[in-house]
Structure formats: structure tokens, C-alpha cells
UniProtKB/Swiss-Prot annotation:
Keywords: Cobalamin biosynthesis, Glutamine amidotransferase. SUPFAM superfamilies: Class I glutamine amidotransferase-like (SSF52317), P-loop containing nucleoside triphosphate hydrolases (SSF52540). It comes from Herminiimonas arsenicoxydans. This is Cobyric acid synthase. The active site is at C331 (nucleophile), H430. Residues 250-438 form the GATase cobBQ-type domain. Belongs to the CobB/CobQ family. CobQ subfamily. CDD domains: CobQ_N (cd05389), GATase1_CobQ (cd01750). Gene3D superfamilies: 3.40.50.880, P-loop containing nucleotide triphosphate hydrolases. Pathway: Cofactor biosynthesis; adenosylcobalamin biosynthesis. One of its GO terms (biological process) is cobalamin biosynthetic process.
Length: 486
């Protein structure tokens, strides 16, 4: 059957209802059928981002959905990306390029301009592809944000597309979520909602069926599919830091998690490694004995450094290094390992200079220009020539004696730094563990002698196929609906 919708939007009753996964699953299914399908999210708010081939920045969810559709990620797939830098402000990225930081009130006033960028990207995609699958953000029931909405029903109304509403039954209250969401919508918004998807169901479906019939009677709209709870998926998480681990080995790696952690998917390969015990440490928790400590990236490096010190972790890191432990710093974590971080132009807040951990002989100056690039190179440590691939997203330049001992060689240039005793390694390279050869080399450098290589791309592909198979009933139900009338 032919897919009847040139554009279809997936909205959720709550955050984390399954919108991203559902769009990815439908992208994979339609691509397998030869449909030229493309994912699209008008506005995304996330610290976990991806770099496109042309050096732009989009939400990692849209990069995953692009992979599901068999496409290279493109900035038109996510024209507006908001990267929170504080509780009330965010960096605004339009068409892949950072514009400036705005507080919530200023951005709300800016939304009509942002909508123009959204519609420009949507217009290009809809002209190039047969089907555009759109992901909403959060919930359309945020009545306080309805004015100037560009992420949910505001966009659907602007392009006149149908909407399906997904709700997570695993968290409870699924019928109230759906009925309550519909009650918050306008008459035209309710009319364009063509059906519901119940996500993450586990149990006896016969016990759910009376509730489904009641829901359909109350709303006059069909339940298009009930999708199962799928365990053990290896898909890029975008919002909350993933705490679960598919394997737990003897080699302990500890990651202190600051408030503004960015690109936590850097650790996905370690989470899946059978010889690794990956532990993410939150506020108030002491850093336990470890073979390797990794300082992650940060959207507010100086602020997160202050928070790390106030949490008592500086002493633990220095003690770990003193007794021969290995430390890796990635992006903002790399900057923290140095002597100072200067922000003369107030890129991250008030201008000033912060004293770093002084574990690497480098100094960093933050600059407004953002480095965005997909990169390929070689490891430059431990007498290895292992290949490495990843991406850079950072604002600032790090220099110093430790840079004469680089971590990697990227396109012929040295990248990153190592301490003179080779205990500390820092780099701007995100995704360094995703290349199996580089992951093995880094773990050997840290003290784990293992031949195991985790292929994250293969695990991701297998998970995309799993979610696509589970979503087949939804696709069948959608194909059975009447196409929209002009």
C-alpha cells in the first residue's frame, strides 16, 4: 500500500513519549520500501548534538533519524537548535550556525523570525522528498507557549499537515494524558489529530483493549497501534544521560556528570563494552576507585568547573592522577584539565578567567567562533597507528607545552594534548570511542588489554531494524487511512 501522507507529524503527550524513536522507525520502514523519506524537527532543545558534513550542527535525534532513512544528516532536518547554557538561557543555532545566546523571554519574541527559518527548511525538504516525517517537541498541550508556537501545532497549522499523538503507557496515566492533551488543543488542532499510538506496552493486550475502545468512543479517533516495550536498544539518547549498561566488566571507568554535560553519547561504546564497568557519578557522590576517569564535554565549561570543584571532585581527580590513574578530558573536560580558562568576551557568561585543574600544561581562551567539523585521523599515543573518526564542536583555543604531545593527528595536524608522564590525555574530539580501533587503543593506553571491539554503527543499525519491525503495524494502519484532501 502507498503511504498516503506527503507530510506527517508525530507529537507526544509528554517529553520522552517515544517521538524520536517512532519517527526513526517509520523512516526506516519507508526507506526499505523505496520511499524517498526525510526526517524533520522544526525546533529542538538538546545539549547532545551532531555535526553535518557541511559543518553545521543539528540535534542528535535528527542525525539518528537520517541514518534510519539512509541519508546523510543535513541542517535542514533541524533548522532551530537550542543548547541551554543556564536555567534561563540558551545558545540559538539556526540552519546549523550559532547566532547568539537568548533568555527565554527574548527567544519567545524572536520566534516569528525563527519560524521563517523553519518554513524555509521545510520547503526545501518537501520539494526534494516524497514524504517528510516531522517530530514535535515536548507536548502540544503547553498552553502557556501556544502563542508563537513553532515546534508543535503551530508548525502543523502553518503547513496544514496531519498529526498522530503518541503516549507512553509505561509511565502510567496514558488515557488521562491523551484526553487531557486533546482538551488543551483548539478545535482545528484536534481535527488534524488523526489517531493515537500507545507506546512501551508490556503485558496482556486483552486487558488493555477495553480501555482502547473507551478511548476511541470518547474521542472519535482511532488507536492506530500499540507498540511494545523494547529492551536493550542501542540508540543515541538526546536528553537525559543514559544510566543503564548492557555489560559490566572488571575495568572501571568513572564519568563525573556536571549539570551542563554535552554529547554524553561519547560513552555509548563504553557502555556496551563487555570488559568495562562504566559508572556515571552525580552530585553528592564521591568518585570511587577507578582505572580511568573521563571528564565529559560541557556547554558551560567555567560554570561546570566551579560546580565540579564545589562538589569536592578536584581533590579526587588530583589524587587519582598522583597514584598513577589515567584521565581523559573531552572538549570542555579537556579545557578543565589545563591551567586556566579565560573568557575575555563573555562567551559563556560574565568575562573572566578560571583556574583549571592544572593536570595538563595548557591554557584555554574561549572565543565566539564555534569550530564544527567531522574529522578523521590517527591515534598519536602508545605507539599505535589506529584510525579514529569523530567530530569537533567547541568554542576556544587550547595551547601549551602538553600540545607538543598530541592525542591524535587529524588531517596532518596535531590535535589534543598529553601530560609528560602520559597519565593525562585531552582532546576536542567527540566520538573518539566510536571507532573500534581507536576505542581499543584508548582502553589499552588506560590499562585494559582486550581484543574486544564494540561496533557502535552495527549495534545502531540492528536497533533501527528492531524498532522498524515493531512499528510495522503502525505503518499498515497509516497506509489504510484515506489520503488527505487538498
Amino acid at each position: 500500500m502507498k503511504f498516503p501522507f506527503p507530510t506527517l507529524m508525530v507529537q507526544g503527550t509528554t517529553s520522552d513519549a517515544g517521538k524520536t524513536t517512532l519517527v526513526a522507525a517509520l523512516c526506516r520502514l519507508l526507506a526499505q520500501q523505496g520511499v524517498r523519506v526525510v526526517p524533520f524537527k522544526p525546533q529542538n532543545m538538546a545539549l547532545n548534538s551532531a555535526v553535518t558534513a557541511d559543518g553545521g550542527e543539528i540535534g542528535r535525534a535528527q542525525a539518528l533519524q537520517a541514518v534510519a532513512a539512509g541519508l546523510p544528516p543535513h541542517t535542514d532536518m533541524n533548522p532551530i537548535l537550542l543548547k541551554p547554557s543556564s536555567d534561563t538561557g540558551a545558545q540559538v543555532i539556526i540552519h546549523g550556525r550559532a547566532r547568539n545566546d537568548m533568555n527565554a523571554r527574548d527567544y519567545h519574541a524572536y520566534k516569528p523570525i525563527a519560524m521563517q527559518a523553519v518554513l524555509e527548511s521545510y520547503g526545501r525538504l518537501s520539494a526534494q522528498y516524497e514524504t517528510v516525517l516531522v517530530e514535535g517537541a515536548g507536548s502540544p498541550a503547553e498552553v502557556n507557549l501556544r502563542d508563537r508556537d513553532i515546534a508543535n501545532m503551530g508548525f502543523a497549522e502553518a503547513v496544514d499537515c496531519p498529526v498522530i499523538l503518541v503516549a507512553d503507557i509505561d509511565r502510567g496515566g496514558v488515557f488521562a494524558h491523551i484526553i487531557g492533551t486533546l482538551a488543551c488543543l483548539s478545535e482545528s488542532e484536534r481535527k488534524r489529530t488523526i489517531g493515537f499510538v500507545i507506546n512501551r506496552f508490556r503485558g496482556d493486550i486483552s486487558l488493555l483493549e477495553p480501555g482502547l475502545r473507551w478511548l476511541e468512543e470518547q474521542t472519535g479517533k482511532p488507536v492506530l497501534a500499540v507498540l511494545p516495550y523494547l529492551h536493550g536498544l542501542f540508540l543515541d539518547a538526546e536528553d537525559a544521560v543514559e544510566q543503564t549498561q548492557t555489560a559490566r566488566g572488571a575495568f572501571r571507568i568513572v564519568v563525573p556528570v556536571p549539570p551542563r554535560i554535552s554529547n554524553h553519547t561519547d560513552f555509548d561504546a563504553l557502555r556496551a563494552h563487555p570488559d568495562v564497568d562504566l559508572q556515571l557519578i552525580g552530585p553528592g557522590q564521591p568518585i570511587p576507585a577507578a582505572d580511568l576517569i573521563i571528564l565529559p564535554g560541557s556547554k558551560n565549561t567555567r560554570g561546570d568547573l566551579d560546580w565540579l570543584i564545589a562538589n569536592g571532585w578536584r581533590e579526587a581527580l588530583i589524587r587519582h592522577a598522583r597514584y598513577g590513574g589515567k584521565i581523559i578530558g573531552i572538549c570542555g573536560g579537556y579545557q578543565m584539565l589545563g591551567k586556566t580558562i579565560a573568557d575575555p568576551q563573555g562567551v559563556e557568561g560574565l568575562p573572566g578567567i578560571s583556574q583549571g585543574l592544572a593536570l595538563l600544561d595548557i591554557t584555554t581562551v574561549l572565543t565566539p567562533e564555534k569550530q564544527l567539523e567531522q574529522v578523521h585521523g590517527m591515534c598519536a599515543f602508545a605507539d599505535t597507528d589506529a584510525a579514529v573518526s569523530g567530530y569537533e564542536i567547541h568554542m576556544g583555543l587550547s595551547e601549551g607545552e602538553a600540545c607538543s604531545h598530541p592525542a591524535f593527528v587529524i588531517a596532518g595536524r596535531p590535535e589534543g594534548a598529553r601530560s609528560a608522564d602520559d597519565q593525562i590525555l585531552g582532546s576536542y574530539l567527540h566520538g573518539m570511542f566510536d571507532t573500534p580501533s581507536a576505542c581499543s587503543a584508548l582502553l589499552r593506553w588506560a590499562g585494559l588489554d582486550s581484543d574486544v571491539a564494540v561496533d557502535t554503527a552495527r549495534l545502531r543499525e540492528a536497533s533501527l531494524d528492531r524498532i522498524a519491525q515493531a512499528a510495522q503495524p503502525l505503518l499498515d494502519a497509516l497506509c489504510a487511512l484515506d489520503p488527505p484532501t487538498a
